[in-house]
Amino acid sequence: MKVAILYSGGKDSSLMAVILDRLGYDVELVTINFGKYDSTIPARTSAKNLGFKHKVIKLDQQILEDAVEMIIKDNFPNNGINYIHHTVLEILSDEYKVIADGTRREDRIPKLKFNEIQSLEDRKNIQYLNLTGIGYKTINDTSDQLFEIQKAESDINTSSDYEMEIRVMLEELGYDTNEIFPQHIQSRVIGWKKNE
């Protein structure tokens, strides 16, 4: 059965790909882009190095614009990022019957609540899988065993998640993204860990 995994090139979505691949799913890594900035390069590189099929899906830039409006209003990114994630899942559920992502137990954003997951699955007759039952310590330990990981301060070149195009649009509108986004480290999968 084919599964579309929302893919940023990070360790969480990479781990989800490995788990589902080993369970026999036909894994297709999917990176979303809105045409504002080609944020897909890190994900494409990571997917290639891991040997997974990768697809970029371009969506209407209005989704990004609506999210940026929310972020400007809130002066904080959470609601805007969650809006994008919910919208992307709704759109992908028209094409895929199984959708997954790397959201984990401690994640706050992007994340669906339990009732939102049930609603999505029931309304669209799909399956939605994530890492909700797994905590960051387990994900870090497992990822460290499997992947070569690069860690860097978040910027538009370190990840392929929604944040990157949001940052570009905010900067074009004259906003200092460092005042809106809390500083954080992005982990990107470079490839499989080599046996020593």
Question: Locations of the language-model features?
Answer:
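Nucleotide-activated chemistry modules centered on ATP-dependent adenylation/adenylyltransferase
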Residues: 1-5, 9-196
